[in-house]
Amino acid sequence: MAYALFLLLPGCPITALALAGYGLGRHRLRQADRQARLRSLAALAGAVAAAVYTVGLLALTLTILDAQDNGADSSPLRPCRVAGHPERAANVTGYRVEYVPLRFVCDTTDGDDYSADAVPGWITPVAAGFAVAGVGCACAAAVEGERRARRGAAAA
């Protein structure tokens, strides 16, 4: 499951840069119509969502590297150690990575699991919020284009 990081870690920043370039690269945006502005805003919102998700992926990658360290003080897994609850960490059998929401999950011997504080809590809501805003702006741009096409067809 952690192998998806090999695709996501380089893919998310490239996507963020491409969307930011599209959103900011519109010529004469001040004179542009509403549809072009909405498309640019959708691209910028998508760029922010991808950039924030990249920050979470970096935090998750560092946590995985810490969990894979097999030196002294590696058992129980360092990311699974919870302050004030040493008994939880003593029962950890392994871990898994979840990408939506972005988190590092520690599995225990009794079949239970808990999320380690590896990824900051603000990453998933901010990334999801900007992604939803980007999709909303893209849909609004499509509706605006359809309205303009209908007005043009009615005038002709």
Give residue spans per PLM region.
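C-terminal region of N-terminal signal peptides and the immediate post-cleavage residues
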Residues: M1-L5, T54-A67
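Membrane-embedded alpha-helical segments of integral membrane proteins
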Residues: M1-Y22
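Membrane-interfacial loop-to-transmembrane-helix junctions in polytopic alpha-helical membrane proteins
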Residues: Y3-L7, Q31-L41, A116-V119
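Juxtamembrane interface at the cytosolic side of transmembrane helices
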Residues: L19-L44, A133-A156
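Membrane-helix interface/capping segments
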Residues: R28-Q31, T61-G71
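Internal/C-terminal transmembrane anchor helices
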Residues: A36-A59
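Extracytoplasmic/lumenal ectodomains and periplasmic regions of secretory and membrane proteins
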Residues: A67-Y99
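Individual transmembrane alpha-helix segments
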Residues: V97-F130
